């Protein structure tokens, strides 16, 4: 059986050798060129392949049509991936009649994604393993062929566990590859309800928070011990790395981060003390804990600390236009939770952001983007990342005020985009799920799905086409003038501060707010055209975390990308949403303050929105780009989101209004 292998790292070497030992004919091996900035402590697949006389390649983009054609010419019967770092396209996966199979370093479906070796130690797991699974478009989600468990000892660190996993992988492959070669390939679907997903880890993730439990700090030390970058802290401005540690249960009442003793070197955590066995100051040598204390000049009672803001670097300045809106105020909260961000914002109101107005890293001006163009241009020039979030985004306004929608959503935002081009600033632009229009795909793919809208005499499409045209203009500026951009497409985000009941009273709100108003006022819940339209509802916390990761832009992976942000698992019709909302309303402790439920009322869309309206039957995102670029997976169930949103609005109704 002819195989093509994609491999890297020690696991790649183990995989290649196991495939050879099982009697496969390896037509070619694809690997990566080593990164000079990376600590390459592991075996070289390219050297192994060269020594075996097997053709080996390291293309920058193996999914390029040229390489797809070359792999097709090899006519593989089967494809294996052993710790190859890039996802393979569906075109490649479909080239092998027997299928494509990946070796993953966890017991799937747990710990999908990146760095499972480190994450299981961070989380204090007692068991992990390796899994061989069929490759599908979605990373780590294919049917399981075989797996092998590995116990994690309390004294295991990243390197010892790595060696255990390599040994387990070799045993697993030795047992299953001969069977697969005979055409007998086991296939067990993964249970999606048990799936967990983890993203890439960065060196800066090793920063110790001494306010965490001592077991958490110790597990972090284990997870990133050499040859990984290490867990670290600061004494004043001096950085030091902890390479090994042990848990001491008694912190002697000391505050977290306090040095309890220097010989042995022990530091207080939230519920105990960490004894530092070995470590190093700055770029020095590794020494025992007591010598490290001498080097750092530590004495009992000294307090270790977090680094100076951004380790001496200027904070990242984020400009949010429409900062008082639903996305803007939640994003502001997320950014201000990080020390290295400063937020500048403008909006015509400040009710939702009042809690930030005295924050030293929040700078707000009340104003209209269509008037304060000089302020906006100055702050685009001043800031690092620009988010133009101002838009009219409620369906009834598309038919009521189509020209105003075009003027604000397109013309005003185009001016901001041109400022970003002029001053070479990165823009994170809110596209919309509406751009997909009446697309017939089962799930909407950012890079492949057609964008289909209705006729000109249906003004409800003015919002969709305004956003779509801006998407295309931004893309063109990126291609022709080097604009750094990311387009994100929210799919029905919900949560507290979504909009207001007053907006719902004039019909200018999102669907759930309108439904809540009906319950609050004791009026019938209106189901437009029966409420059978399906949407995928996404919790604002999930959405904001994805958006935050776009702003962080780890490894510049979001540059030039379009990213859907939605929860495909939370698909429900508007009628189902209303039923769930009613159930939550009846169970709410404030239920007794509101009128009886007035029932459901089916209403034609024409009578509600006007003759210019046209609806879509479903809107479901593919989130593969978000998984790949952000290491992100939505996790919050729709019921939780509905209950939190309902609670926020019910508690916003004052007592007198409830009684009336």
UniProtKB/Swiss-Prot annotation:
Positions bound to NAD(+): 347, 368-369
Catalytic activity: UDP-alpha-D-glucuronate + NAD(+) = UDP-beta-L-threo-pentopyranos-4-ulose + CO2 + NADH; UDP-4-amino-4-deoxy-beta-L-arabinose + (6R)-10-formyltetrahydrofolate = UDP-4-deoxy-4-formamido-beta-L-arabinose + (6S)-5,6,7,8-tetrahydrofolate + H(+)
Species per Swiss-Prot/TrEMBL record: Salmonella paratyphi B (strain ATCC BAA-1250 / SPB7)
GO cellular component terms given for this protein: membrane
Binding site for (6R)-10-formyltetrahydrofolate: 114, 136-140
Gene3D superfamilies: 3.40.50.12230, NAD(P)-binding Rossmann-like Domain
Site (Transition state stabilizer): 102
Role: Bifunctional enzyme that catalyzes the oxidative decarboxylation of UDP-glucuronic acid (UDP-GlcUA) to UDP-4-keto-arabinose (UDP-Ara4O) and the addition of a formyl group to UDP-4-amino-4-deoxy-L-arabinose (UDP-L-Ara4N) to form UDP-L-4-formamido-arabinose (UDP-L-Ara4FN). The modified arabinose is attached to lipid A and is required for resistance to polymyxin and cationic antimicrobial peptides.
Recorded family membership: In the N-terminal section; belongs to the Fmt family. UDP-L-Ara4N formyltransferase subfamily.
Residue positions of the active site: 104 (proton donor), 434 (proton acceptor), 619 (proton donor)
Protein known as: Bifunctional polymyxin resistance protein ArnA
Residues with site note (Raises pKa of active site His): 140
Highest taxon of the lineage: Bacteria
Subunit annotation: Homohexamer, formed by a dimer of trimers.
Positions of UDP-alpha-D-glucuronate binding: 393, 398, 432-433, 460, 492, 526-535, 613
MF annotations from Gene Ontology: carboxy-lyase activity; UDP-4-amino-4-deoxy-L-arabinose formyltransferase activity; UDP-glucuronate dehydrogenase activity
EC number(s) on file: 2.1.2.13, 1.1.1.305
One Gene Ontology biological process: response to antibiotic
Known pathway: Nucleotide-sugar biosynthesis; UDP-4-deoxy-4-formamido-beta-L-arabinose biosynthesis; UDP-4-deoxy-4-formamido-beta-L-arabinose from UDP-alpha-D-glucuronate: step 1/3; Nucleotide-sugar biosynthesis; UDP-4-deoxy-4-formamido-beta-L-arabinose biosynthesis; UDP-4-deoxy-4-formamido-beta-L-arabinose from UDP-alpha-D-glucuronate: step 3/3; Bacterial outer membrane biogenesis; lipopolysaccharide biosynthesis
Stretches for region Formyltransferase ArnAFT: 1-304
């Amino acid at each position: 059986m002819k195989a093509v292998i994609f491999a890297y790292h020690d696991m790649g070497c183990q995989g290649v050798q196991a495939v050879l030992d099982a009697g496969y004919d390896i037509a070619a091996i694809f690997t990566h060129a080593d990164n000079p900035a990376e600590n390459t402590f592991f075996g070289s697949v390219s050297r192994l392949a060269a020594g075996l006389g097997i053709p080996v390649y390291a293309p920058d983009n193996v999914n390029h049509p040229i390489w797809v054609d070359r792999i097709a010419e090899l006519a593989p019967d089967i494809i294996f991936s052993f710790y190859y770092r890039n996802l393979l396209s569906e075109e490649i996966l479909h080239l092998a009649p027997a299928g494509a199979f990946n070796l993953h370093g966890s017991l799937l479906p747990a710990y999908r994604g990146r760095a499972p070796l480190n994450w299981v130690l961070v989380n204090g797991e007692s068991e992990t393993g390796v899994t061989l699974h069929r490759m599908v478009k979605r990373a780590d989600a294919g049917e399981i062929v075989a797996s092998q468990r590995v116990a994690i000892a309390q004294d295991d660190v990243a390197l010892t566990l790595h060696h255990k996993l390599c040994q387990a992988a070799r045993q697993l492959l030795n047992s299953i590859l001969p069977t697969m070669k005979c055409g007998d390939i086991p296939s067990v679907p993964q249970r999606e309800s048990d799936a967990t997903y983890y993203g890439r880890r960065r060196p800066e993730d090793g920063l110790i928070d001494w306010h965490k439990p001592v077991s958490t700090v110790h597990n972090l030390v284990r997870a990133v011990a050499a040859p990984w970058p290490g867990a670290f802290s600061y004494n004043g401005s001096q950085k030091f790395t902890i390479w090994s540690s042990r848990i001491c249960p008694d912190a002697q009442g000391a505050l977290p981060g306090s040095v309890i003793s220097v010989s042995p070197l022990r530091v207080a955590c939230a519920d105990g003390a960490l004894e530092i066995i070995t470590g190093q100051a700055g770029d020095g040598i590794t020494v025992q804990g007591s010598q490290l204390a001498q080097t750092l000049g530590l004495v009992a009672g000294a307090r270790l600390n977090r680094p100076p803001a951004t380790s001496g670097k200027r904070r990242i300045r984020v400009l949010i236009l429409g900062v008082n809106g639903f996305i803007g105020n939640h994003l502001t909260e997320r950014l201000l939770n990080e020390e290295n961000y400063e937020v500048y914002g403008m909006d015509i109101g400040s009710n939702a952001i009042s809690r930030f107005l005295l924050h030293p890293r929040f700078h707000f001006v009340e104003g209209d983007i269509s008037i304060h163009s000089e302020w906006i241009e100055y702050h685009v020039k001043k800031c690092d990342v620009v988010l133009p979030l101002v838009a009219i985004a409620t369906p009834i306004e598309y038919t009521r005020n189509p020209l105003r929608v075009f003027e604000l959503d397109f013309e005003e935002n185009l001016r901001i985009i041109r400022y970003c081009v002029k001053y070479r600033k990165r823009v994170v632009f809110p596209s919309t799920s509406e751009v997909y229009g009446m697309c017939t795909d089962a799930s909407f793919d950012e890079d492949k799905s057609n964008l289909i809208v209705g006729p000109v005499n249906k003004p409800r499409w003015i919002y969709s086409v305004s956003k779509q045209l801006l998407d295309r203009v931004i893309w063109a500026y990126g291609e022709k003038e080097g604009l750094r951009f990311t387009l994100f497409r929210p799919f029905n985000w919900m949560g507290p501060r979504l909009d207001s009941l007053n907006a719902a009273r004039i019909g200018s709100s999102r669907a759930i707010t309108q439904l809540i108003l009906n319950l609050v006022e004791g009026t019938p819940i209106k189901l437009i055209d029966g409420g059978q339209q399906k949407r995928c509802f996404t919790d604002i916390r999930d959405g904001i975390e994805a958006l935050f990761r776009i702003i962080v832009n780890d490894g510049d992976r979001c540059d030039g990308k379009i990213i859907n942000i939605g929860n495909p698992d939370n698909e429900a019709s508007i009628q189902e949403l209303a039923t769930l909302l009613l159930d939550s309303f009846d169970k709410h402790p404030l239920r007794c303050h509101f009128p009886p439920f007035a029932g459901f009322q089916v209403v034609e869309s024409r009578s509600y929105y006007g003759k210019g309206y046209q609806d879509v039957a479903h809107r479901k995102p593919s989130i593969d780009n978000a998984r790949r670029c952000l290491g992100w997976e939505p996790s919050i169930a729709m019921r939780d989101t509905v209950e939190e949103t309902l609670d926020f609005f019910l508690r916003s109704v004052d007592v007198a209004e409830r009684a009336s």
